[in-house]
């Protein structure tokens, strides 16, 4: 669960922008006024990881952060605990689950900087 606040609506693209300690998120338009606090549910399986700033993709939410912890969470699966936000600033902790193969190919390790990619359609409003 991520606590956010609505900061903007884009009526042309029917999107809402929300702010939180880890950055900004865009999602399908919410029919709530600017300034409204919104709790979002973000599933670990809905977060992809990049080790360099990604370019040329359709993902609307790309958030900088670092790997706080990582552990095996099932056969062939690794769960990463991520701290989203700029280094040295308060951030937001989320979890991402990726394959062990992906973690190995990316040479992921604790403390490394990452970019979390989150599809807008993966965000769900928690009332």
Residue map of PLM features:
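Short aromatic-glycine-enriched beta-strand elements
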Residues: 12-17, 73-82
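Glycine/charge-rich catalytic "coupling/switch" loops of P-loop NTPases
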Residues: 22-72, 89-92, 97-127
């Amino acid at each position: 669960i991520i606590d956010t606040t609505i900061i903007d609506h884009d009526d042309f693209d029917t999107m809402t922008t929300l702010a939180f300690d880890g950055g900004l998120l865009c999602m399908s338009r919410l029919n709530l006024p600017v300034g409204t606090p919104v709790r979002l549910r973000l599933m670990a399986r809905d977060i992809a990881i990049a080790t360099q700033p990604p370019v040329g993709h359709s993902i609307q939410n790309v958030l900088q952060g670092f790997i706080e912890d990582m552990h095996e969470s099932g056969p062939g699966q690794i769960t990463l605990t991520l701290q989203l936000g700029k280094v040295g600033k308060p951030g937001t902790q989320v979890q991402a689950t990726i394959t062990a193969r992906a973690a190995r190919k990316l040479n992921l390790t604790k403390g490394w900087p990452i970019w979390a990619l989150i599809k807008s359609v993966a965000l769900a409003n928690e009332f």
